[in-house]
Amino acid sequence: MSNPILLGIFWHFIGAASAACFYAPFKQVKNWSWETMWSLGGFFSWIILPWSISWWLLPDFWRYYGSFDMATLLPIFLFGAMWGIGNINYGLTMRYLGMSMGIGIAIGVTLIIGTLMTPVLQGKFSVLFGSPGGQMTLLGVLVAVIGVAIVSYAGLLKERALGIRAEEFSLKKGLILAVMCGIFSAGMSFAMDAAKPMHTAAQALGINSLYVALPSYVVIMGGGAIVNLGFCFIRLATCKGISLKADLAQAKPLLIANALFAILGGVMWYLQFFFYAWGHANIPADYTYISWMLHMSFYVLCGGIVGLLFKEWKAVGQKPVRMLVLGCVVIILAANIVGLGMAV
């Protein structure tokens, strides 16, 4: 396995670790509605950071974006909005299925759809079955799905041991939302593929290959921001029991602490895709669709590791922990299979 491929896998792991940890600062926010907290964190992760970093990277910010026609930008933006819808469905999935089953189904679906639909849309799917490297990467995707399923089962055992139930358990609603979440969340993978002309243009300007994907985030995350912020603002304006005015009426020290924690959560959220771009840059051109599989499977892996480190599995018994460790090992095996497939 070559060094660039190993680096690509490593950076995807770092990005996934940031994704697994980003909600920790949000948990420190007190006496704010979820909508206010998510909007502030999201404003930094979807707007401030993508724009600031692109402004710093690009020699002429406005000329760069003005060089693309609407036929190029609109699909990227819409795929970003599609991914934003997936974000909203994610929370609803947890409500109706619980964390473990919800994550298992949603991540499993988005891993498969986001990974395999890209080569299908490119007309390259049959090529994967006809080459040893393609066959091995497909095997790695299958093993990753199995690993995600095992970790999710471990989480289900943990929830049962701790007596945790979904807020409003509904298998029918939850399954529909989980599948929708998985499909729509794959929009980020499609957006990255559609943004290749933007990556090429950034590289032509002399931008380091590790950073060429970052300017496209202005458009991709712009689509996601409109969906997420619109959803939050509508709820703040129409739902009884929550209001921006009430959230901002808290004592000044609490306001400052809440704002800092929300911003930190937003920064950590953005870092997952910052390092996703680094990992993506090191993946061979014929296998860029694998980036999504690596990111999502490592996200589940890192979520399990973070749970162990924070002693969330302390009182659940040995079987759930053994299943968690087994699932993590299977995901690591999947990453190695995919890496070997890309190296063939």
Swiss-Prot record:
It catalyses: L-rhamnopyranose(in) + H(+)(in) = L-rhamnopyranose(out) + H(+)(out). The chain crosses the membrane at residues 4-24, 38-58, 68-88, 101-121, 137-157, 175-195, 214-234, 255-275, 290-310, 324-344. It is a multi-pass membrane protein. One of its GO terms (cellular component) is plasma membrane. The keyword Cell inner membrane applies. Its main location: membrane. The keyword Nuclease does not apply. Keywords: Cell inner membrane, Cell membrane, Membrane, Sugar transport, Symport, Transmembrane, Transmembrane helix, Transport. Disulfide bonds: none annotated. GO terms for molecular function: rhamnose transmembrane transporter activity; symporter activity. It is found in: Cell inner membrane. Pfam families: RhaT. Uptake of L-rhamnose across the cytoplasmic membrane with the concomitant transport of protons into the cell (symport system). Belongs to the L-rhamnose transporter (TC 2.A.7.6) family. This is L-rhamnose-proton symporter. It comes from Pectobacterium atrosepticum (strain SCRI 1043 / ATCC BAA-672). The lineage of its organism: Bacteria, Pseudomonadati, Pseudomonadota, Gammaproteobacteria, Enterobacterales.
